[in-house]
Amino acid sequence: MSRVTLSRYLIEQTRSNNTPADLRFLIEVVARACKEISHAVSKGALGGVLGSMGTENVQGEVQKKLDVISNEILLEANEWGGHLAGMASEEMDNAYQIPGKYPKGAYLLVFDPLDGSSNIDINAPVGTIFSVLRCPNEYLSQNEALNEKAFLQPGTEQVAAGYAIYGPQTMLVLTLGDGVKGFTLDREMGSFVLTHEDITIPETTQEFAVNMSNQRHWEAPVQRYVSELLAGEDGPLKKNYNMRWVAAMVADVHRILTRGGLFMYPRDSREPSKPGKLRLMYEANPMSFLVEQAGGASTDGHQRILDIQPEGLHQRVAVYLGSKEEVERATAYHKE
């Protein structure tokens, strides 16, 4: 039986599910950019790509060389194809305008070019997260600059989302709104090949992922919930849990999509004006879309993340996502 490449899968989606051809082309271009990023990441010290740039992004985070390289790869790959009205990235303060010499399309691409880049220098997994939205008609123009308000749509408006994870294998995990598929990069073929047909998250779990060093800063409902997880079979939940933490959202969520679990990044008291650390538009929304499509759940502790109306490109949120039973339990504690 012949293997199904990403290109073949997308063509079949166009035929059977009426996936628009321009969306298919856009996903293929993003995938090609991810292959190029994977190649740059794999070179490591041999390619002179390790270390920091000495600059900060809009989040106030020090930019790694590979943050900037990955951002440029995605911009250059996607700006000329005629599929996009604009792009936005973790590494840029403002939306990226499609150069006037290129035609504009109907979609918006939002991405974190290299999630978990603090892991680069220790050779741990990193990844690229992306979200695709339709550009509202009132903001579509071939001649005028794109208004950033075009991007401020709730996650329910996403038409596609996914991530590439650069680990022992490079994988692309994708949803078009009809389940979640996983594609592994065959470097000999140069193609992503369908290897995970129907990714599903179990409703129950005995694993959780959270940065325990922040425990003293958490709100009371989170303190209560995590203490119950740690109490194991002697506590109110009556079962033992294991904790995992990779310090890259893409890697922790990939594990949850592979075998279940709960990922948490709660808000804390150090920056009370900020509702969380992770960014809604290009981290929480695409990952929540994937998790829900795989049968899991995702909230900010109070409401479904995909229902949140964004107020800015770089808005932050608290995140609880993964196996439905545990997400619902953590959310219920916030409402008591």
UniProtKB/Swiss-Prot annotation:
What InterPro entries would the database entry show? FBPase_C_dom, FBPase_class-1, FBPase_N, FBPtase
**Which protein is depicted?**
Fructose-1,6-bisphosphatase class 1
Which residues bind Mg(2+) 1 per the record? E90, D112, L114
By its UniProt entry, which Gene3D superfamilies does this protein fall under?
3.40.190.80, Fructose-1,6-Bisphosphatase, subunit A, domain 1
What Gene Ontology terms for biological process does this UniProt record contain? fructose 1,6-bisphosphate metabolic process; fructose 6-phosphate metabolic process; fructose metabolic process; gluconeogenesis; sucrose biosynthetic process
Spell out the family assignment given in the record's similarity comment.
Answer: Belongs to the FBPase class 1 family.
What quaternary structure, including any partners, is listed in this protein's UniProt entry? Homotetramer.
* Cofactor section: Mg(2+)
Sites where the protein binds Mg(2+) 2: D112, D115, E283
Membrane-traversing stretches: none
This protein's GO CC annotations: cytosol
* Gene that this polypeptide is encoded by: fbp
